[in-house]
Amino acid sequence: MPEPGPDASGTASAPPPQPPPQPPAPKESPFSIRNLLNGDHHRPPPKPQPPPRTLFAPASAAAAAAAAAAAAAKGALEGAAGFALSQVGDLAFPRFEIPAQRFALPAHYLERSPAWWYPYTLTPAGGHLPRPEASEKALLRDSSPASGTDRDSPEPLLKADPDHKELDSKSPDEIILEESDSEEGKKEGEAVPGAAGTTVGATTATPGSEDWKAGAESPEKKPACRKKKTRTVFSRSQVFQLESTFDMKRYLSSSERAGLAASLHLTETQVKIWFQNRRNKWKRQLAAELEAANLSHAAAQRIVRVPILYHENSAAEGAAAAAGAPVPVSQPLLTFPHPVYYSHPVVSSVPLLRPV
């Protein structure tokens, strides 16, 4: 067997040349777009989710099989896509916080506003929670037959259910709206009469409506009470005849009054009223005269002082004093040695003389 040549042995024993080593591939950043979209590749594949619980049991086995097939198809789609819908919640998205004061109404305004305007309540953390009474009223509004036309008006909300008027959680604006609507209804009921000629029964139930009716009827009755009295003007001959009759008789009988009215061309009522006024005037005159007499009598009761004005032998005393002879002193003719007080002015001031 011939030995192989040096060329053949050299080529057979020499190792094959190796290619130059390639540089390592650059490591992808965990914040790359593909990683953010596809999620983490090292996570195990998601487990198939159990079928959702239904509130009502399926009507047949075919419905149950269809629900299971739908759940399996959903799990397969999620596995093929490489990420589950539940992983979306694990992604860290940047959070933007916007101050609520710039885009929201003030809290006190929203709290006071009626439910049909803003059906949410403000929480201390700034969240918005649906108001229970607003949701109930919205359902009542949608179910009411008038919801198609008056959907934007507050009247269906306030008049949909009378039981909701007793809720304590109502805002002041809703209460004011209800009161105004009821008052308008009352006024309309008072103004519009019924088919039988009577007003609406609701207006007569409250005492306020009775007061309103009394006030409405009073202007019609007041003109009747405020009739202008006609003043009768008597002629001189009529006044003279009436005065002469009054001097003879203060009160007339019906027959006398009728005869006097016929003679003077007056009515019996005019004659009767004239005699009433004349009697009142006569009574006033009597009272004035009596008062004047009482005043004069009271003035006469005043005490009058009467001094001593005359002595009997005043002339003889004067002559004796001139001659210088003593004259026997005698008492004066007046019975009172001192001034006397008389109680009546009729008494004359002449001194009372004593007979000798």
From Swiss-Prot:
Listed SMART domains: HOX
Biased composition (Basic and acidic residues): 130-140, 149-173, 210-223
Xref: CDD domains: homeodomain
Localization: Nucleus
GO molecular function: DNA-binding transcription factor activity, RNA polymerase II-specific; RNA polymerase II transcription regulatory region sequence-specific DNA binding; sequence-specific DNA binding
Effect on the protein upon substituting Q276K: Abolishes DNA-binding
Classification via PROSITE patterns: HOMEOBOX_1 (PS00027), HOMEOBOX_2 (PS50071)
Domain of life (superkingdom): Eukaryota
Protein task: Transcription factor involved in specification of neuronal cell types and which is required for inner ear and hypothalamus development. Binds to the 5'-CAAGTG-3' core sequence. Controls semicircular canal formation in the inner ear. Also required for hypothalamic/pituitary axis of the CNS.
Protein name (database record): Homeobox protein HMX3
Origin species: Mus musculus (Mouse)
Organism taxonomic ancestry: Eukaryota, Metazoa, Chordata, Craniata, Vertebrata
